[in-house]
Swiss-Prot record:
<dbReference type="Pfam" id="PF00132">
    <property type="entry name" value="Hexapep"/>
</dbReference>
<feature type="compositionally biased region" description="Low complexity">
    <location>
        <begin position="350"/>
        <end position="362"/>
    </location>
</feature>
<feature type="region of interest" description="Disordered">
    <location>
        <begin position="346"/>
        <end position="373"/>
    </location>
</feature>
<dbReference type="InterPro" id="IPR018357">
    <property type="entry name" value="Hexapep_transf_CS"/>
</dbReference>
<dbReference type="GO" id="GO:0016020">
    <property type="term" value="C:membrane"/>
</dbReference>
<dbReference type="Pfam" id="PF04613">
    <property type="entry name" value="LpxD"/>
</dbReference>
<dbReference type="InterPro" id="IPR011004">
    <property type="entry name" value="Trimer_LpxA-like_sf"/>
</dbReference>
<comment type="pathway">
    <text>Bacterial outer membrane biogenesis; LPS lipid A biosynthesis.</text>
</comment>
<protein>
    <recommendedName>
        <fullName>UDP-3-O-acylglucosamine N-acyltransferase 2</fullName>
        <ecNumber>2.3.1.191</ecNumber>
    </recommendedName>
</protein>
<dbReference type="GO" id="GO:0016410">
    <property type="term" value="F:N-acyltransferase activity"/>
</dbReference>
<keyword id="KW-0012">Acyltransferase</keyword>
<dbReference type="InterPro" id="IPR007691">
    <property type="entry name" value="LpxD"/>
</dbReference>
<keyword id="KW-0444">Lipid biosynthesis</keyword>
<dbReference type="InterPro" id="IPR020573">
    <property type="entry name" value="UDP_GlcNAc_AcTrfase_non-rep"/>
</dbReference>
<comment type="subunit">
    <text>Homotrimer.</text>
</comment>
<keyword id="KW-0677">Repeat</keyword>
<comment type="similarity">
    <text>Belongs to the transferase hexapeptide repeat family. LpxD subfamily.</text>
</comment>
Amino acid sequence: MSESGFFLDAVGLSVGDIVALTGATPRDGADLSRAISDLAPLDRAGIADLSFIAETKYAGVLAATQAGAVLTTERFAHLAPESVAVLRIAKPYEAFVAVARRLYPSALRPTSLFGTLGVAPGAVVHPSAKLAAGVTVDPGAVIGPRAEIGKGSLIGANAVIGPHVKIGADCAIGAGCTVTHSEIGDRVIVHPGSQIGQDGFGYISSANGHTKVPQIGRVVIHDDVEIGAGSNIDRGGMRDTVIGQGTKIDNLCQIGHNCVIGRHCIIVAQSGLSGSVTVEDFAVLGARTGVIPHITIGKGAMLASRSTVYSNVPAGAVWGGFPAQSKRQWMREVVALRQLAARDHDGRTAASAEAAAPSSDATGVDQPDQAAS
């Protein structure tokens, strides 16, 4: 449910529009002309709201909802009140997201403070910089010599784009970001306060102290990457730091120099990758994952929250713990330790220790929550 004023470009849809957009099947007698202007959870929805149900635990809430329309599987369709336009579909949450994207396009990326195209008063653009058609530069932003900004991109307030940086089309660089020594593809989103292209953490240590190693690589970010607020991506030492197409990096993450992250990876908040780490395609790193230098995380591997990785992770593996290891072995060790800790002075073991083992889904990746939709 949106608070009024934050998303001024919100558009309305009819139930019929939602059917056409999602391919859902309406219940007999559903009013396809009913106007839907907002989204809301089942227990807060009104006649102009769309909601959804995907889990059994919300069946009772569905039976009492006042929503104008509900996306649901066939399993729950009969529970909705007669006043609700029931839209049956195999994957209701995915359909709900499709509608949300249509209703609230400005919620998909950072937007201009003033919502106007062009260079705002107070922004500084070097005469040699190249700005394509439809670029927006908000107040306080600075764009350096020979930088190139692609068609339709946004440079937020107080962002700094360094010399020779290339940013593709339809990108959004949020307020307060710094981008240097980088080449960025199309449709890349960088949320406020992130820093990209600063020098990597490279030193030679001796008895006399620490001598800085010049970092002469770049950061290369491919199309459709999203980087959360307050994250940092260091440029490479003698090769590039690379973020592959479609990868999503959460808030407050650190990507060290020379890292190569593949396509469509997920890196959840507060994770840190040391230098020269390779993360292969479709890998998932749960919140607060830490990885030491020169490690490879295989294609499709998953790391539970707070994993600390000291060795290569095989493709498709599910690991967790400190040090990270296979989920099966990690859980056995946790159970064994808890059994030992629970023994009383007579040596008895608490039978419930195994029930306290970690959840099998401990990545920290958000899952759809009916009550918070």
